Amino acid sequence: MECKRARAYSSSANLGSGFDILSMAHTAFFDTVEICVETKNSENIVIESNSKIPLEPNRNSATYPLVRIMEERGIKASLRVKVIKGIPEGLGLGSSGASATAAVMAFSSLFNLNLSKEDLVRYAMYGEIASSGSPHPDNVAASVFGGVVSVVSVNPVKVVEIPLNYSFNILLFVPLNIHIEEKTKKAREMVPKTVKLSDYINNSRYISSLLIGFVKGERDLIRLGLNDEIVEKARLPLFPYYPKIKEIAIKYDAVGSCVSGAGPSILVLTDKMTDENKIAEEGTKTCNEFNVECEVIKAKIAGGVEVERRN
């Protein structure tokens, strides 16, 4: 029985005002997906996992992309798919996107499809449909490419890797006792359909500030760019502790802070000028004030999805 296994890292989408556009892959967590071909003359997908994920192929973020690839490319096979979840689910860390990305990469390797990175993103987006009903591309793009990415087009898929000329580390405040059913779907429903022109202009300025800050290595521009007037504000009921954590992060000279994806996790960028211990200590106290138990995770920028070698 031939098998392939791939690993994809967690990610933080939006990065302030870059809703459905920007995302960052990091080493905080990763998912692994192993796909084995049992027979090539029938069509069946059996799912195994260490987590309570849907076992129906069309409802599973790892296997629904495979269903679509097989339909589109006329591939017939009976598959056993093992999804090893390392990324906490429903916490704004790209869990479904990483599973989808790892699955598509393993499948591409198994069937020698040699899919381009953009095709990996395009197929992995089906995993987001299975998870939340929306094919948002930002998390899967980060998990595919690694680093910081901008999704500049979805039809066709076009992703640009953002050059990083400023060295920073990552702190994540990850709530352990928050669980919201269909969180991503609900969070997307909270995003306003219309916005004030002044908010739109400010958000456009933030995006340009962040990207220029990354490219030119300018700390102040990165800090300014990690702000948002629209989406974070609309979703604040999901993470009421966020404004104070951000205030603490800036107080102790973090590069900047924002909500990780749809939350409730919070992303803080740090460097040699930052007092990480104070941010972790006071940020954890803030979580507790809101009856939220937060784990603080230290991470770095991650690379893209990879096929794991078998010993």
Curated annotation (Swiss-Prot):
The entry sums up its family as follows: Belongs to the GHMP kinase family. Homoserine kinase subfamily.
Give the chief site where it resides: cytoplasm
Q: Which gene encodes it?
A: thrB
Q: Per UniProt, which keywords does this protein have?
A: Amino-acid biosynthesis, ATP-binding, Cytoplasm, Kinase, Nucleotide-binding, Threonine biosynthesis, Transferase
Write the protein's name.
Homoserine kinase
Write down the NCBIfam families for this protein, in alphabetical order: PRK01212.1-4 (NF002288), thrB (TIGR00191)
What's one GO BP annotation on this UniProt entry?
A: threonine biosynthetic process
Q: Give the species this sequence originates from.
A: Saccharolobus islandicus (strain Y.G.57.14 / Yellowstone #1) (Sulfolobus islandicus)
Kindly list the GO CC terms recorded for this protein.
Answer: cytoplasm
Under the heading InterPro entries, the entry gives: GHMP_kinase_C_dom (IPR013750), GHMP_kinase_C_sf (IPR036554), GHMP_kinase_N_dom (IPR006204), GHMP_knse_ATP-bd_CS (IPR006203), Homoserine_kinase (IPR000870), Ribosomal_Su5_D2-typ_SF (IPR020568), Ribsml_uS5_D2-typ_fold_subgr (IPR014721)
Q: In which pathway does it act?
A: Amino-acid biosynthesis; L-threonine biosynthesis; L-threonine from L-aspartate: step 4/5
Could you say which EC number(s) this protein's record lists?
A: 2.7.1.39
**What chemistry does it catalyse, as a reaction equation?**
L-homoserine + ATP = O-phospho-L-homoserine + ADP + H(+)
Cellular localisation: Cytoplasm
- Give one GO term, molecular function aspect: homoserine kinase activity
- Report the protein's function: Catalyzes the ATP-dependent phosphorylation of L-homoserine to L-homoserine phosphate.
Tell me the SUPFAM superfamilies matching this sequence: GHMP Kinase, C-terminal domain, Ribosomal protein S5 domain 2-like
Per UniProt, the enzyme's principal EC class comes to: transferase
In this chain, ATP is annotated as bound at 88-98
